[in-house]
Curated annotation (Swiss-Prot):
Reported function: Binds directly to 23S rRNA. The L1 stalk is quite mobile in the ribosome, and is involved in E site tRNA release.
Pfam families per record: Ribosomal_L1 (PF00687)
Gene3D superfamilies assigned: 3.30.190.20, 3.40.50.790
Family the UniProt entry places it in: Belongs to the universal ribosomal protein uL1 family.
Protein's name according to its UniProt entry: Large ribosomal subunit protein uL1
An annotated Gene Ontology molecular function: structural constituent of ribosome
Domain of life: Bacteria
UniProt xrefs under PANTHER family: 54S RIBOSOMAL PROTEIN L1, MITOCHONDRIAL (PTHR36427), LARGE RIBOSOMAL SUBUNIT PROTEIN UL1M (PTHR36427:SF3)
UniProt gene name: rplA
PROSITE patterns registered for this protein in UniProt: RIBOSOMAL_L1
One Gene Ontology term, aspect cellular component: large ribosomal subunit
Subunit architecture: Part of the 50S ribosomal subunit.
């Protein structure tokens, strides 16, 4: 059995496990919990009644957080020539072509997001086993395979996040830091909840979003009533 810290136990005692909270209430409760000497990350987790093994129920997409995540993403871009220059000028942290592909294949993973121009995807595709499991593989559907590398880089730097349901039907999102005010966290939470609802597969009947939780790095999750997200 995991032994929890005194602060964690104190925080857990504040959560009524027989109650489901609104997002506002959950955020306020989370911010009232004992403080730590670092700025905790705040996360939203949703449980969906989907079967990710079915292609038409694989919920994935992107969302722009109105207040960002509180972390500036480190962006890697696979491009060459003028497009590589554009990516660098747009603020990409790492830019390259064949040599960079080899470097990533060799284990380099010090980045948070990946963008590629279409002409690079023939070779970038070889990195599927490295990038795929980490949710970093560029994809046209999420705007990360594109000739407009300037927009892609600036969107990611500005708070655009990518998501994909896991094998158990869960979606996790970073929605900010504990230093954010409550309204900013609430607006970020609503942005991701609205996008998740918008992407409900047509083949899913009945309740789709079955569970929602807001949590932070060191604190227990606070359950949010899915009915309040309608």
């Amino acid at each position: 059995m995991v032994k929890r810290s005194k602060k964690y136990r104190e925080a857990a005692e504040r959560v009524d496990r027989n109650n489901l909270y609104t997002a506002n209430e959950a955020i306020a409760l989370l911010k009232s919990m004992p403080a730590y000497n670092f700025d905790q990350t705040v996360e939203a987790v949703f449980r969906l009644s989907v079967d990710p093994r079915k292609a038409d129920q694989l919920v994935r997409g992107t969302v722009n957080l109105p207040h960002g995540t509180g972390k500036t993403a480190k962006v890697l871009v696979f491009a060459r020539g003028p497009k590589a220059t554009e990516a660098t000028e747009a603020g990409a942290d790492i830019v390259g072509d064949d040599d960079l592909i080899a470097k990533v294949q060799g284990g380099f993973l010090d980045f948070d997001a990946v963008v590629a121009t279409p002409d690079m995807m023939g070779k970038v595709g070889r990195l599927g086993r490295v990038l795929g499991p980490r949710g970093l593989m560029p994809n046209p559907k999420t705007g990360t395979v594109t000739m407009d590398v300037t927009k892609a880089v600036k969107d990611i730097k500005g708070g655009k996040i990518e998501f994909r349901v896991d094998k158990n039907g869960n979606l996790s999102f970073l929605i900010g830091k504990m230093s954010f005010d409550e309204s900013a966290l609430d607006e970020n939470f609503k942005a991701v909840a609205d996008e998740v609802k918008r992407l409900k597969p047509a083949t899913v009947k009945g309740r789709y979003l079955t569970k929602a939780t807001i949590t932070s790095t060191m604190n227990p999750g606070v359950p949010v009533d899915p009915n309040t997200l309608a």
